[in-house]
C-alpha cells in the first residue's frame, strides 16, 4: 500500500543516490554551519535526505519503514492528511537546532542523515506501544521502552565522549520531539502510555 512513509523513503533514496553521484549536490545539501549562517537555511531540511553511505541509508530507511507505517495513521487527520509528513520534516529540523547552536562557528562541522526524523518516528511508536518488541541488530528482541532508555543513555554518553561522525545529539532531540509532538497532537496518548507501561506484556 502506498503511503506517506513509502513516499518519504522513495524521495530520500533518490536524493541520496543523486548526491552520491554528484559531489556538488552532496555539498549543497549537507548541513554546514557557515553556509547556514550565510542564509542557506534550507540545509536544516536537506541534510535529512542524504546519507553517508548505503548502510547509513539502509538502516534509517528500514527503521522508518517498519515504524512509520505503524504510526502514520495517528497523524493523518491533521494538516489535510499531511500531518505525518510535516511531523517528520519538523523532526529533522528541530533535531538539528541544538547541534547548530553548539557548532555555529565551527567551519569543520558537517552533518547528514535522516536520524532526527527517524528517531522521532521510533519514539512516537514507543509511546504508543511501550512493550512491543524491537529487534536489536534484527535478531535480539527487547521491549521498546527498555530500548528507549538504553538509546537515550547511550546517546548522552556518546555525545559527551565525542570522536564520532554520528550526530548523537540529533538522535536524542529527534526522539524528544517525537514524544512531545505526539502528546500535543493527541493528549490521550499520555494516559494510554502510562496505562500500558503499568501493564507489561512480554
Model-derived features with residue positions:
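A detector for small-residue-rich transmembrane helices and their helix-helix packing motifs
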Residues: 1-202
